Amino acid sequence: MQNAVIYQPVQIEYLKKTSDLFSEQQLADSFVLIFHLKGNGYISIGTNTNPLQKKTLYVCPPNETFGFTPAADGHIDACIIRLLSYIKETGQDIFTPCTESELAKLKLMNVSHIENLAVRLQELAALWNESSQLSQLKCVIEVQSLIYDLFTASLSDQTDTHSAIEKTKHYIETHADTKITLAQLSQMAGISAKHYSESFKKWTGQSVTEFITKTRITKAKRLMAKSNCKLKEIAHQTGYQDEFYFSRIFKKYTGCSPTSYMKKRRKKIAAYGRGTMGHLIPLHHIPFAAALHPKWTSYYYQHYSTDIPVQLSAYRFNEKWEENLYTLSQAEPDVIVSMDSISPEEQDRLNRIAEVMYLPSEESWRTHFLQTASFLKEESEAEKWLADYDQQTTAAKKTLQHVQGLRFLFLRLHKQNFYLAHNRSVREVFFGDLGFSSATTADTPSEQAISLENIANYQADCMMLFLFKEPETIAYYQQLQQTEAWQNLSAVRDNRVYLLSLDPWNEYSACGHERIVQQTVSLLSGDCP
């Protein structure tokens, strides 16, 4: 007898439109089946972002992140089913948790031919919200039936265009230095050139030519940052025989010439840990190495991932620090920028890799920024940037005069507990530079959980809420919103609860603080008392 597998639903939710909860990537602690039924936009799973395909099943594995970016109309219909897999192996009497699941094989499956799927998913979500044991039992049974239908349909699904597209994408990425033609790629995919072009655009959001050029420019940037190659050599290694044509294409896509780009990247700077990259970017120095992730460092990932050749792990911020130190040691940077608050072991190992400039954690972000600028001989650029920042805060205060009299409370919700979240950036930028009023005193502890009753006692006019993007927290918050205790909070009654992402509010840096000012204006400029 073969191994037996059972799938236990952890959460089922049917979304009729995009929610702020899913705009920022969230962490999956189990397999997540994402059924996209209607609407346009993009879906990100880990570091891969692609246009949403109607009637398509996406699968996010455990310990990975996912999120939606809606199109301009912002409308989407989707169902999210979180599942735990259990397996009973031959000869065993019990089911044990299984992280390696056949569910992964269902990713990007076309589900249009599964009968009454939208209705079934809506009914599943409704069953999940019922509290009776019979409803929960039926829900588990219906989930097994749905998964059976998915696997059955996948066996008879003979169309595998997406796999062919992925195969050709990989070929482009690994053969960027060679001549690549549409005829060659379509032949490799086993479909006509017209069908291939249309399918490629559908699945990637880019034309074949755009993808090839982007791949070559990204490779060129990394060669410029990692080596002392001549421009002609870089052009040849990225598929361009004419270095002058390459220069024109490079400037068109990046806004600067290859010579200017290489001049800025001559010094190989590694930004180690949180916040340090935020002092380099305003000085127009893109680091050679830095921690990047689409969830934990989303801004830097979106804007600079193609420019940074050595990408350290930012998974759960610095959870993989030992792996990062090894990567840095292999990359051989010229200098490393780090906070001095890292562990003695990290400091010792960093010191053996390269020269390290430590920023003193007890000093202010302005001191950190000016110290970084002094090290890079960019003092005048730093002074100009700070003057511009001060002008931005002055303008923001004028724009937000109508809410200056309100009292703000920053909270973070993790699992089923609230905590005060008046961190250093919030205190110095929001309450300091922007001059808003706090609903709490500066000496209130932030590690201690607080009750809804205590939150009510603060009598805050506005609540700024950091919601941890993981299943238990999201489920609790959705239930909490239906309770009388929550609805009676004055900020809730006045519709002044603002959901915030941790980025940039937990980044103590020049770039992070500029983005806090900009985000505050965006959030509050339309709020009229």
Swiss-Prot record:
Keywords: Activator, Cytoplasm, DNA-binding, Transcription, Transcription regulation. Its main location: cytoplasm. Induction: Repressed by Fur in the presence of iron. Gene3D superfamilies: Homeodomain-like (1.10.10.60), Nitrogenase molybdenum iron protein domain (3.40.50.1980). Residues 268-528 form the Fe/B12 periplasmic-binding domain. It is found in: Cytoplasm. One of its GO terms (cellular component) is cytoplasm. InterPro entries: ABC_transptr_periplasmic_BD, Homeodomain-like_sf, HTH_AraC, HTH_AraC-typ_CS, Tscrpt_reg_AraC-type_HTH. Binds with high affinity to both apo-bacillibactin and iron-bacillibactin. PANTHER family: ARAC-FAMILY TRANSCRIPTIONAL REGULATOR, HTH-TYPE TRANSCRIPTIONAL ACTIVATOR RHAS. This is HTH-type transcriptional activator Btr.
